[in-house]
């Protein structure tokens, strides 16, 4: 759905492992890396869209992850004219996104890039939370910085027992050390 200002409603996903490393997917047949993301369908909430995109692009189900938080407002980026589909030209400017920070409760073997007929990624890796964004397409970099910065305060949120939502008793202001990255190729 495109709003009256020309922005398509979308969700972005920052997925953390137990070391606070983030999931990066390599765009199929391209050299760019990105976080999972996708459009919100009519009648779908941002959270429902996030779970659908997580399953379609990464193969993870709701029980594989814990929601740590989301951005307070929509983050927007404009898409350069040469990237806009012909039938969208004239009324489409770009994307507006709600970003979710998730903790993987499962393991690496739960990730599958081939759960849909049209995979988005052909490889994936874990990388430090704060990493240079040169491998991200240029027009998305500022939104990535905004989302990572806003959600960084949640990095040290401890694992929460299933069904418990009492985050208010924890102090999430500190940040811990990050380690190197590991890469995974599509099977």
Swiss-Prot record:
Keywords: Hydrolase. A motif (Nudix box) lies at residues 38-59. Belongs to the Nudix hydrolase family. RppH subfamily. Residues 6-149 form the Nudix hydrolase domain. It holds the Pfam family NUDIX. The lineage of its organism: Bacteria, Pseudomonadati, Pseudomonadota, Betaproteobacteria, Nitrosomonadales. NCBIfam families: PRK00714.1-2, PRK00714.1-4, PRK00714.1-5. It comes from Nitrosospira multiformis (strain ATCC 25196 / NCIMB 11849 / C 71). Accelerates the degradation of transcripts by removing pyrophosphate from the 5'-end of triphosphorylated RNA, leading to a more labile monophosphorylated state that can stimulate subsequent ribonuclease cleavage. The gene is rppH. Its EC number is 3.6.1.-. GO terms for biological process: mRNA catabolic process. GO terms for molecular function: mRNA 5'-diphosphatase activity. PANTHER family: M7GPPPN-MRNA HYDROLASE (PTHR23114:SF17). This is RNA pyrophosphohydrolase. GO terms for cellular component: cytoplasm. Its cofactor is a divalent metal cation. InterPro entries: Nudix_hydrolase, NUDIX_hydrolase-like_dom_sf, NUDIX_hydrolase_CS, NUDIX_hydrolase_dom, RppH. It comes from the Bacteria. The keyword Zinc does not apply.
């Amino acid at each position: 759905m495109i709003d009256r200002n020309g922005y398509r409603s979308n969700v972005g996903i920052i997925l953390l492992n137990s070391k606070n490393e983030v999931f990066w997917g390599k765009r199929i047949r391209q050299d760019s890396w990105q976080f999972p993301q996708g459009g919100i369908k009519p009648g779908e909430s941002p959270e429902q869209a996030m779970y659908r995109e997580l399953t379609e692009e990464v193969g993870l189900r709701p029980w594989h992850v814990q929601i740590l938080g989301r951005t307070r407002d929509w983050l927007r980026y404009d898409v350069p004219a040469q990237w806009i589909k012909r039938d969208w030209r004239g009324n489409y400017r770009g994307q507006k996104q709600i970003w979710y920070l998730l903790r993987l409760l499962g393991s690496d073997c739960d990730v599958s890039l081939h759960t849909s007929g049209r995979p988005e990624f052909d490889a994936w890796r874990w990388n430090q939370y704060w990493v240079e964004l040169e491998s991200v397409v240029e027009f998305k970099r500022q939104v990535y910085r905004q989302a990572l910065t806003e959600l960084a305060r949640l990095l040290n949120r401890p694992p929460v027992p299933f069904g418990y939502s009492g985050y208010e008793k924890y102090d999430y202001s500190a940040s811990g050390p990050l380690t190197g990255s590991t890469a995974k190729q599509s099977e």
